[in-house]
Amino acid sequence: CLVGSEMCIRDRADTIVDDDSFDQADFLRKVAAYPECPKSACPSPEVYQRGFEADAEHLYAVTLSAELSGSYNSAELGKSLTLEEHPDKKIHVFNSKSASIGETLIALKIQECEEAGMEFEQVVETVDAYIESQHTYFVLENLETLRKNGRLSRVKALVASALKVKPVMGATPEGTICQLDQARGINKALVKMVDYVKEGENNSSDKILAISHCNCPERAQMVKEALLERMQVKDVIILDTAGVSSMYANDGGIIVAM
């Protein structure tokens, strides 16, 4: 059983829960309208604890990278609270060391292992190895969220915007964000990202290509086609970004994981 716990996004006027009711278009309008950046809040340990009380033999949670969010530590505490009352439960919290579509791929890997009839410990070992082999890349159209969060100075954001410089970003093995490259214009940045994806995958035919996009399905399709021209994959998934991913990717952002 995969335990779901929704993060919240708060701005001056609203609290938005990142769940199935999330309205991406409405959220993007609100983000564009407010000068201040919305803030995200991870689920409390008690929220995870309630999820871990599900009647299932094996329980798993997949969290946003521990280097980017308090979700992993919160889930681990929720696990400890649950095991105090139910010491026989089998629970594992996976630190995705990724975000967005990367977490989706990990959840699918867990499902695959469970459907194959693996023992709990074997599932954990297999999925941990999968996480270590996974790569995440992204390109942002809009740098305003990074600027509003204090991760990019106003001057740098304005210069980047004026010069149409788009960073090509990735996740480190530890789950932090790094800049891999940059390019003048979004299309050139996406081409560079495709290059990095191709160079980073040796056995792509056994992997799922996963792409999430923030309000730019045509751009996601273009990235998919560019990658499939250069590599074979087992399957392709394209999804809209959810709440927290939309907050950081911002309108026009593209995330790729394999």
PLM features: what roles do these ranges have?
Residues 176-258:
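Gly/His-enriched, cation/cofactor- and phosphate-binding structural elements
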Residues 58-65, 92-95, 109, 208-212:
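Short glycine-rich or small-residue beta-strand-to-loop segments that form or flank ligand, phosphate
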Residues 112-179:
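Internal, active-site/partner-interface "lid" segment
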Residues 70-136:
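Active-site histidine-anchored catalytic micro-motif
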Residues 65-73, 98-101, 216-218, 246:
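Gly/Ser/Thr-rich loops at beta-strand to alpha-helix junctions
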Residues 14-75, 80-84:
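Class I S-adenosyl-L-methionine
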Residues 1-4, 8-9:
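Single conserved hydrophobic/aromatic residue that forms the stacking wall/gate
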